[in-house]
Structure formats: structure tokens, C-alpha cells
């Protein structure tokens, strides 16, 4: 880490009360006040859930289209042929192909942020799964990225779909906007994400579902949020 970045983080850390738990509204205000980079930083929420990802039925994974998008221009690649390939192109997909797209991926040409595939293409996609998987790009029915309706999937991706899943520690990290967004947009996006995660709560999960939560920017320390208030948001 460069000295300038380390100094900036130290300065920002001094603005945050490490043990303070912020209300949702004040937390959003606080995290926006920490914006200091020369670029428009991403606002990220981290939610630690009361699940054990080692159990298949508690592996939370899904997708949500944020009402105000993420603020990021998303490049979309689609594995499809024939009519479905035409539908994907007409919907605004940046890259559409089949064997040729797989070859591009094998050659390291991955200039896209999301991959969508029709079900009949999954055998082909599986051949590049070792490349796409670690990058979080592998299409999955749970995130709506393996589908016949490629036009809708492309539209969702372009309008701000966020794919999420718990990591090994039971934490979901997800972008919910940019530092330049007003507070209302960030709150709306966060509420939509929490609703989506709540809908996926497994019946086998015991105790409090959202154990802890925080907000941060790309270049800022984290702001602790009131998790109970977050769970009560409707």
C-alpha cells in the first residue's frame, strides 16, 4: 500500500467511531462523507448472515435488480445461437457467440462483467468453467443467468442486476451504488437487496438471520450498521 493511500485511510479512520453502531440513515450519510478518492467510489454493503455455507441448503445465492442501478456500465457476454443470439444482440449484449466466445475466453480475452447462457449452451460453457468460476462469471440458474429469456437477462444486467452469494464465513458483499448517489438512492438499493436476501432465508437457519452489517466505500473504512433496523426495513 502506498504511503499516500495509507495516510488517507488513517485520516478517514479517525472520522469513524470504531465501536459506534449507526442507524441506517446516519450510516449512509456517514459513509458518503468519507468519499475522498479522485474517482467515484463504489458503496458496498457487507452482511454477515446466521447461516453455515458448508450446508447446501444454507448456501445463499441469488440476484436482484437494484432500482437505481449500481452506477457501473456493465458489459455483458451471452452464449447463444440462432434466434436467441439475435435476441441477445438486439437487447444490447456486448458480446454474443458460442464456440468462438469460448475460444476468446480460453485465450484470456475476458472484457465483460457478466455472462449469460441459454440452457443448451451450458455444456460448452462448462468447458471454460475453470476460467469463469474463479472470476465469479459462471452462469447460474439461481441468478437468472442461465435462461431462455436472454433479452430479459441482458436488460436486467444492463439496468443494475447484482449477483450475490455468501462466502465461506457466511458474509455477503454487494455493491449498492456510487458515492455520488444521493442518500435516498443508496437506501432504496440497500432495501431491495435486503428484501431479496430475506426471501432466501433457509428454514434450517437458526437465530438472528442478519448478525452484523456494515457500509464502506472503495477506499474507506467500514461503518457499522444497526442490523436489527436493517431486518425491520420493509
Curated annotation (Swiss-Prot):
Family matches, as CDD domains: Ribosomal_L1
Cross-referenced PROSITE patterns: RIBOSOMAL_L1 (PS01199)
What is the role of this chain? Binds directly to 23S rRNA. The L1 stalk is quite mobile in the ribosome, and is involved in E site tRNA release.
A biological process (GO) annotation for this entry? translation
Task: Tell me what organism the protein belongs to.
Answer: Helicobacter hepaticus (strain ATCC 51449 / 3B1)
Mind telling me which NCBIfam families this protein's record contains? rplA_bact (TIGR01169)
Family, similarity comment = Belongs to the universal ribosomal protein uL1 family.
Which of UniProt's keywords are assigned here? Answer: Repressor, Ribonucleoprotein, Ribosomal protein, RNA-binding, rRNA-binding, Translation regulation, tRNA-binding
MF term (GO), any:
structural constituent of ribosome
Name one matching Pfam family.
Ribosomal_L1
Q: Does the keyword Manganese apply?
A: no
Q: What is this protein called?
A: Large ribosomal subunit protein uL1
- Which HAMAP family does the entry mention? Ribosomal_uL1_B
What's an example GO cellular component term for this entry?
cytosolic large ribosomal subunit
| Coiled coil residues, start to end | none
Q: What does the subunit section of this Swiss-Prot or TrEMBL entry state?
A: Part of the 50S ribosomal subunit.
Q: Which gene encodes it?
A: rplA
Amino acid at each position: 500500500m502506498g504511503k499516500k493511500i495509507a495516510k488517507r485511510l488513517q485520516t478517514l479512520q479517525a472520522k469513524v467511531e470504531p465501536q459506534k453502531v449507526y442507524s441506517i440513515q446516519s450510516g449512509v450519510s456517514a459513509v458518503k462523507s468519507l468519499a475522498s478518492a479522485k474517482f467515484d467510489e463504489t458503496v458496498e454493503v457487507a452482511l454477515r448472515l446466521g447461516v453455515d455455507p458448508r450446508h447446501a441448503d444454507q448456501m445463499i445465492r441469488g440476484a436482484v435488480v437494484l432500482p437505481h442501478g449500481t452506477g457501473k456500465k456493465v458489459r455483458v457476454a451471452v452464449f447463444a445461437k440462432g434466434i436467441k443470439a439475435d435476441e441477445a444482440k438486439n437487447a444490447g449484449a456486448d458480446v454474443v457467440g458460442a464456440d468462438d466466445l469460448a475460444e476468446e475466453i480460453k485465450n484470456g480475452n475476458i472484457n465483460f462483467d457478466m455472462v449469460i447462457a441459454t440452457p443448451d449452451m451450458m455444456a460448452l460453457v462448462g468447458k471454460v468453467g475453470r476460467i469463469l468460476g474463479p472470476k465469479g462469471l459462471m452462469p447460474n440458474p439461481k441468478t437468472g443467468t442461465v435462461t431462455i429469456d436472454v433479452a430479459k437477462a441482458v436488460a436486467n444486467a444492463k439496468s443494475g442486476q447484482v449477483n450475490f452469494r455468501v462466502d465461506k464465513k457466511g458474509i455477503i458483499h454487494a455493491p449498492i451504488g456510487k458515492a455520488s448517489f444521493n442518500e435516498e438512492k443508496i437506501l432504496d438499493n440497500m432495501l431491495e437487496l435486503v428484501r431479496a436476501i430475506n426471501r432466501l432465508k433457509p428454514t434450517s437457519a437458526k437465530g438472528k438471520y442478519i448478525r452484523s452489517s456494515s457500509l464502506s466505500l472503495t477506499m474507506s473504512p467500514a461503518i457499522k450498521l444497526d442490523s436489527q433496523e436493517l431486518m425491520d426495513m420493509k
